[in-house]
């Protein structure tokens, strides 16, 4: 039984599908959900000639992350469930979303991680990377991958 389920949320349709699956699982097993969104500020620091103020950019990313979590929390609530939310900020290029999700799953501690995957292959996967793949490689608990159709 999965009593504590961490759900990675990024606001994409794939993430929404993962949330739907986590909601079903929580209803069936009486699980507690923790919705986690990772804000990655690192790429903004790669270019010193940014045409915007970094503090404004950081605030915008943080606000967008909060909205994504609020929307996901509302979906959970509409299904008669409750959940906790957690916003994690990455501020250096040495930190990675996958590592932060796995670390949060350990701290909480989750019995299961639910995450959406876009199913990228080839060059797109090489260029864009995969948070889901990084989670699978380093998580100690089971990971449920959900691929949106």
Q: Where on the chain are the PLM-derived regions?
A:
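Feature marks short, surface-exposed loop/turn motifs that line or immediately flank catalytic pockets
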Residues: 39-42, 91, 121
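Gly/Ser-rich helix-loop-strand patches that form or flank binding pockets
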Residues: 24, 105-149
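Structural beta-alpha unit
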Residues: 74-113
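Small/aliphatic-rich secondary-structure junction motif
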Residues: 3-52, 75-84
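Acidic, proline/glycine-rich short linear motifs
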Residues: 38-67, 100-103
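Residue-level recognition of beta-strand->loop/alpha-helix junctions
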Residues: 37, 87-89, 147
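Aromatic/hydrophobic pocket-lining residues that form π-stacking "cages" and hydrophobic walls in ligand
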Residues: 22, 72, 101, 135
């Amino acid at each position: 039984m999965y009593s504590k389920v961490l759900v990675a949320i990024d606001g994409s349709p794939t993430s929404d599908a993962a949330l739907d699956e986590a909601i079903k699982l929580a209803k069936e097993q009486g699980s507690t959900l923790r919705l986690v969104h990772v804000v990655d500020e690192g790429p903004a620091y790669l270019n010193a000639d940014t045409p915007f103020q970094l503090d404004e950019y950081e605030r915008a990313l943080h606000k967008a992350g909060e909205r994504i979590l609020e929307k996901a929390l509302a979906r959970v609530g509409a299904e008669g469930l409750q959940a906790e939310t957690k916003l994690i900020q990455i501020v250096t290029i040495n930190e990675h979303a996958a590592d932060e999700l796995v670390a949060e799953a350990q701290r909480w501690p989750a019995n299961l991680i639910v995450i959406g995957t876009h199913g990228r292959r080839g060059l797109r996967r090489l260029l864009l990377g995969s948070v889901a793949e990084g989670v699978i490689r380093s998580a100690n608990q089971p990971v449920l991958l959900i691929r949106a159709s």
